[in-house]
Amino acid sequence: MASPVVSLLLVGICALAFVHVARSECCTSRELVEFKMDRGDCEAVRAIENYPNGCEVTICADGVAQLGAYCGQGSCNIFGCNCDGGCLSGDWSQEFVRRNQQYGIQIIKVTRLPF
């Protein structure tokens, strides 16, 4: 009969064999974009009015207004990590302007969050 220490060690080694390499990317970054529009209103791009500057929206890297708490392609855990499909990618505010070029958006200020 093996000692309890050896048995626990063998169980631990076997358990490690089933563990996959984990890479938990967190999708908590976002940008707060303040901008003016030549045409249309703030709601057209899912933004809110920010008087007197124009409009304000929080976007993900793909240039789309943030939906939900995080910027993952799919659902994320409660910390914004391990999102199904990884994080959204793109050129942030540049992508926002490209996607909404029909409104003549002029960026005033961009703040990346978290700092």
From Swiss-Prot:
The lineage of its organism: Eukaryota, Metazoa, Ecdysozoa, Arthropoda, Hexapoda. This is Protein Diedel. Residues 1-24 form the signal peptide. GO terms for biological process: defense response to virus; immune system process; response to bacterium. GO terms for cellular component: extracellular space. Induction: By viral infection with Drosophila C virus (DCV), feline herpesvirus (FHV), Sindbis virus (SINV) and vesicular stomatitis virus (VSV). Strongest induction occurs with SINV and VSV. Highest levels of induction occur 6-24 hours after infection with levels declining steadily until 96 hours after infection. Induction requires the dorsal-related immunity factor Dif but does not require the myeloid differentiation primary response protein MyD88. By muscle tissue stress. Detected in hemolymph (at protein level). Also expressed in the fat body and is probably synthesized in the fat body and secreted into the hemolymph. It is found in: Secreted. InterPro entries: Diedel. The name 'Diedel' is the German translation of Tweedle and is based on the fictional Lewis Carroll characters Tweedledum and Tweedledee due to the presence of two subdomains within the protein. The keyword NADP does not apply.
